[in-house]
Amino acid sequence: MEPHFDVNPRANRDLDEHYLYIRRDSPEAAVRLLRAADSTFRQLARTPYLGAEFPVQRPDLAGLRIWQVEGFRNYVIYYRPIEGGIEVVRVLHAARDVPAALDEPG
C-alpha cells in the first residue's frame, strides 16, 4: 500500500493563505510553494519519523513533529505519523507564535 497523507482543513486554509500572500508579489513562487508542500508531504508520508518531535501540552496533539517545506525554509509543516502515512495538522510561517496558532479553532 502506498503511504498517504491527510491534510486537515486548518492546514489546507494555511496553505491557501500562504499561496494568496505570496501570489501578490510572485505568482510563480506561490505555485512553487504548493508543489513543494505536496512533495514534502509525500516524502514525510514515506518516512514519517523524519521530522523532529515538537513538544506540546495538548494531549490531542501528542506525537506532533515538524519539518520544513522543501525549498521554503520559512514554512514549517506540523504533522503526526498515522497508520500508513501522516496527518498534516498545520503549515505555518516560521515567524508565527506556534503555541497560539496550534490553539486556534479548527
Name each model feature, range by range.
Residues 49-83:
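Basic/aromatic recognition patch in beta-strand/loop cores that engages polyanionic ligands
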Residues 27, 42, 46-50, 72, ...:
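Generic structural signal for secondary-structure transition and capping sites
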Residues 18, 47, 101-104:
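Residue-level signal for well-ordered alpha-helical positions
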Residues 69-106:
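Enriched for short, Lys/Arg-rich terminal
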Residues 31, 35-45, 64-67, 71:
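PIN-domain endoribonuclease scaffold, especially VapC-family toxins
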Residues 1-36:
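Arg/Lys-rich, positively charged N-terminal/basic patches that mediate binding to nucleic acids
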Residues 31-32, 52-56, 100:
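Short, hydrophobic secondary-structure boundary micro-motifs
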Residues 10, 39, 97:
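Residue-level recognition of oxygen-bearing side chains
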